Amino acid sequence: MSVAVRGVLRRAVDVFRDEPEIAKLLHQQLDRLDEPLRVAIAGKVKAGKSTLLNALVGEDIAPTDAGECTRVVTWYQDGRTPKVVMYPRSGPPTSLPVHRRDGALAIDLQGTAPEQLDRLVVDWPSQSLRTATLIDTPGIASASTEIARRTWAFLAPEDDSLTEADAVIYLMRHLHSADAQFLESFQDQTVARASSVNTIAVLSRADEVGGGRVDGMFSAKAIARRYQAEPTLRSLCQTVIPVAGLLALTGRTLRQAEFAALKKLAHSPREHADAMLLSVDHFLAPDHSAGSSDSETPTSQNALSREIRHSLLERFGLFGIRLSTTLIRQGTDTPSGLAAELVRRSGMNELAEVLHTLFTQRSDLLKARSALRALEHVLSSSTNAATKDLGGDVERILGGAHELTELRLLSAMRSDEVDLPRAEHAEAERLLGGSGVAPAVRLSLSADANPAQLQQAALEALGRWQRHAENPLFSRVAAEACRAVVRSCEGMLTNLPRE
């Protein structure tokens, strides 16, 4: 499909060669096909967007305070050297100094008001950013309507212009009407209309769901499953993943001194440590220092200063401190071991796997979809007589690209527009690539399945869905869906390796 999209874009560039602005836009779409996927991170204020971005990258590069930078749409992309450039709404871009404060990247707008900026672009050498450019957006439903408007304007513009994001990670702490409204507005696009396959929802700050209890993530997972089963949300996003972003970030950036402090706390008398961890106030109280041989009279040698305790709270949160001390008592005795366990329990590994399966593996398709959407937008507003043939080319791509048929059908199925029986409905979603595009995933086989096993499973699925397509009891809509699944099975059989 990407080859066909490149071809029609090149023809469009030639058609609009005398219209510089449009030609420039089309050239940008061609370049975009060779760039990393653009993934926006959105959500309400204090949902943990910047913290999650930092956790995904594994470094403190996105400001997490309520400073001026969090009021600007900020792009983070892979680069050879660190660089920060601000793009004003009018005037040339300006490079900003790159410096760190307390280990985190600090961005100084040098007196420029956030309202005057279109965006910030941060180049940062990062393996994580080579497959996806991450876009941090201001919080929606902000007390400042101007701040919230920027995210709406970027991801769901009202003037019929196009979003620059290929996909979205949407963070929510609870499911509110504002969340559903935002997701609906982002999905309302022309190509593969209302396709939920480019959106993932994250139940953010999941460690706070259980009141900071060590088992709080279990409660968060149950809530995420319940949200995922709700028809409204199911029609708007692929899945819902609970993630404790702060825990993940701290796990990926754990310091030796922090481990030493946690170990000291874990090995202090249990009653004393439990009393400290009752609440934030207890943990920061002047008479609560860890590591004494006597719970009331801690020794100066083993005491944790208030400064250290405050730093631990900022980095781990109360949940992270409770979990870390529990893990250390249970035998996690190295910084690397604790770091790995914190990341594992944060939900970040599950999110990374979902991002790889649903976004990275589908990146060429999602980028091609964005390019077609841009071309459709140009053609719909053009008076150039030569665009008629281009419109026909786009229609042929849309009609012949089974990958887009899969996207549209997956969206329709998640909106309960396809009346298949429950078991067949679930299998159809999987065979269409709803859980990932790899043949083993589509066929519900293990990742190490050999070609013969894949071939056999695909043949069985093909025969099964050919029978479903001829079932006289199925509605016309269901029968059309079955035929699309048949085509997906045929495509797998064509592309599977032979032994």
Where in this protein do the model-derived segments appear?
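Charged, low-complexity interaction regions
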Residues: 17-21, 384
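Charged, amphipathic alpha-helical linker segments immediately N-terminal to NTP-binding catalytic cores
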Residues: 1-17
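Active-site-adjacent bridging/hinge elements
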Residues: 48, 322-330, 434-435, 460-466
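Globular "head" domains of long coiled-coil molecular machines
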Residues: 30, 34-275, 345
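Cytosolic juxtamembrane amphipathic/interface segments immediately preceding
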Residues: 25-29
